[in-house]
C-alpha cells in the first residue's frame, strides 16, 4: 500500500471507520474567505476552477490552513499541466478535506454503496478526499508531490475513459507491464535525498503499480506529468522504461510539452 494512501474502488482494501458529522459549534468560526456559509457543517471553497470542502470547525486551524495553502499550489500546477478537456472533468466534483478520518492521506471514492455501508457520507461518491490532511501535507513534502494528481487521475479514469476502470487500453498496458516484470523490486524515493534501489527487498512488499490497473494508471500519470516516488520517477524514465505505458499516456492525455 502506498504509504497508506488508500483508494476506495475495492472496499476490502479500505480501513473501516465510522464517519461522524460534527456539530460545528459557535466558538471556532472566525474570518473566512468571502461570505462563506457552512452547509451541513462544511465550507465550500473554490480555487482555479477546483472546489473543495472542509469542516467549519477545522477551517481556521493552523493544520487546515497549511493544507489549504498546499492544495491551492497543487491546483495551480495541475491546471498548468493538463489539457482543458481533462480539467473540465476534474473540476466538476469537489475535493473533501478531513483532519484524520483515516491514518492514510488521500483516496478516491468510486462506490456509493461502500460509503453507505461504512457509515461515510454518500455525498463523497465520485470525489477525491484528503482523508487525513495532516498526512497529506507531510507526505507531499516528503516524497509524494503529485498525490492529489494521482487521485484525480483515478477520477478521470473512472468517469471519462471509455469503459471506466475496465478501459481496454489501460488494462493492456498494465497486463504487458506485469507480464514483463517491469514493476518488481524497482527503486523508490524515500525523500528528496534518498533513493533505495530495491523496493520489494527493503519493504518486503510489492511496488504499488502492481496492485491493479487502476493504481498502475495513476502511478504512471504521476511520472508522466511530474514526479513519482516509485520508479519510473519522471517523464524520461517512463518513456525509456515502460514504452507501452508511455504510449498509453500520450493516447489518454496527448503529447506533453517537455
What feature does the model see in each segment?
Residues 1-4:
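Positively charged n-region of N-terminal signal peptides that target proteins for export
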Residues 6-10:
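Sec-dependent N-terminal signal peptides
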Residues 15-16:
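C-terminal motif of bacterial Sec signal peptides marking the signal peptidase cleavage site
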Residues 23-46:
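N-terminal low-complexity, Pro/Thr/Ser-rich intrinsically disordered segments
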Residues 44-65:
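Acidic/histidine-rich, surface-exposed loop or edge segments in extracytoplasmic proteins
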Residues 55, 63-179, 246:
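Acidic/His-rich structured neighborhood in mature extracellular/periplasmic domains
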Residues 122, 172-258:
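Metalloprotease/metallohydrolase-associated module, dominated by Zn2+-dependent proteases
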